[in-house]
C-alpha cells in the first residue's frame, strides 16, 4: 500500500515540484498552504492534488510529512506535529534521501539554476527515462527512471544533504544577505557542497570565486575562453536563438542550437553539454533535443497582448537583471526595452542598491514597484524603492498596481517585468489595461 505524503507549504516552487514527482510515481499526495494564489498551484490542481488551508486536522500519524523550509514552529501544522511527536522531514533532507535510488545530476549556482536544470531535464528525459525536479515548480516522477535531475539550492546551506553523482555549478555571487555574511561565506558553502559530489563537477571557468573551489571529484571547467575544458565558440546570436560549437581537449564534440537568448543561456547549454558528454550520452541526441527546449516558467516567459510584447522573468538580483535585458535585446534589437522591476527583500535591496541601479540602467526606461518583503524579515524603514529610483540614470518612476498607465507612454517597446515577489500583479494590471484599450477602440 502506498503511503500518503502531506506537504506543509505545498505551493513553494521546490515543494510543488516534489509533490508532482511523487504523485506521478504512484504515491498519494496532498498538501496545505496559504490561500493566496501562486503560479505553482495550477500544475498541482491539474494533477488532482488536494491543496488545503493550514489546519491541525490535515495531519494523521500515518502520514509522511514534508515541511517547506519557510515554515517554522509558528505554523499550526508544524507546531501540532512537534507537540504530538509526529516526525517530519524538511524538503532538503527528504530530497537528500530520495536521490540515493538514482544516478543524480544536480545544478547549483547563484544564478541560472532553474533554466539549466530545465534544459538538462528536457534533454535527458527525451533520451532516456528520467525523473526531475525544477525550481519553477515542475516535477516528473517515474518509478523506472535511472536518472534524477534536480536543482540544488545554496540558501541556508540547504544543499548540504545532497551527494549527487554529477553537479554543475553555474556561478558564485553574493546574494541572500539575510543569511550569508559575504562572498567568502558563499564560496565556503559551495566548496563544502562540491566536496560531496561523487563523480564529476562542471564549473564555469571564468568565475574567479568558482576557480577557488576544490573537490575530490574531477572538476571540468566550461566557458568561452581558451584554457577551459569545454569551450563554446563560433557563436552566432540571432533573433531565433543562439548557434555555437563546443570543443573539448581540442576536438569538436558538436554544433548546437538553443532557442534561447542571452550569453548566459549559451553558458547554461555548454554546462549541460559538458555534463552529458562526460556521462557518456550521445552528442548527436543532445544536439537534437537542445533545439526543442521551450524554456521554464517565469524565465523569459513571453506573451503578446494587443500587439504588445510582455516578458515575465524571475530576475531579482543585479546579475540576473543584466542577463535578462541582454536576452531581450538579442531577440528584439530594434525595440525599446522597458524594465518593470520589483526589489525582493529589504536586506537584498540595502546590500545591493548601487548594483541594482547599474543593472537597471541597461534598460531604456525603468519603472519600479514597491519592495516585496519576505516573510522572514520586518520593514525597519531603512530603505524605500524611491532610494533606488534616485540612483537610476535612465528615465525612471515608481508605479502602483492600481495605476500602471505610465507604461503606455512608449512606442515600439518590449516590457520586461522582473522580480521574485508579486510583480505578476503589476503585469496582470498592465495586461488588463491593454485589453481594455482594445475593447474601447473596437
UniProtKB/Swiss-Prot annotation:
Pfam families: Mur_ligase, Mur_ligase_C, Mur_ligase_M. Its main location: cytoplasm. It is found in: Cytoplasm. It is an enzyme of class 6 (ligase). Its EC number is 6.3.2.8. It comes from the Bacteria. Keywords: ATP-binding, Cell cycle, Cell division, Cell shape, Cell wall biogenesis/degradation, Cytoplasm, Ligase, Nucleotide-binding, Peptidoglycan synthesis. One of its GO terms (molecular function) is ATP binding. ATP binds at residues 109-115. It catalyses: UDP-N-acetyl-alpha-D-muramate + L-alanine + ATP = UDP-N-acetyl-alpha-D-muramoyl-L-alanine + ADP + phosphate + H(+). Pathway: Cell wall biogenesis; peptidoglycan biosynthesis. InterPro entries: Mur-like_cat_sf, Mur_ligase_C, Mur_ligase_C_dom_sf, Mur_ligase_cen, Mur_ligase_N, MurCDEF_pg_biosynth, UDP-N-AcMur_Ala_ligase_MurC. GO terms for biological process: cell division; cell wall organization; peptidoglycan biosynthetic process; regulation of cell shape. Cell wall formation. Belongs to the MurCDEF family. This is UDP-N-acetylmuramate--L-alanine ligase.
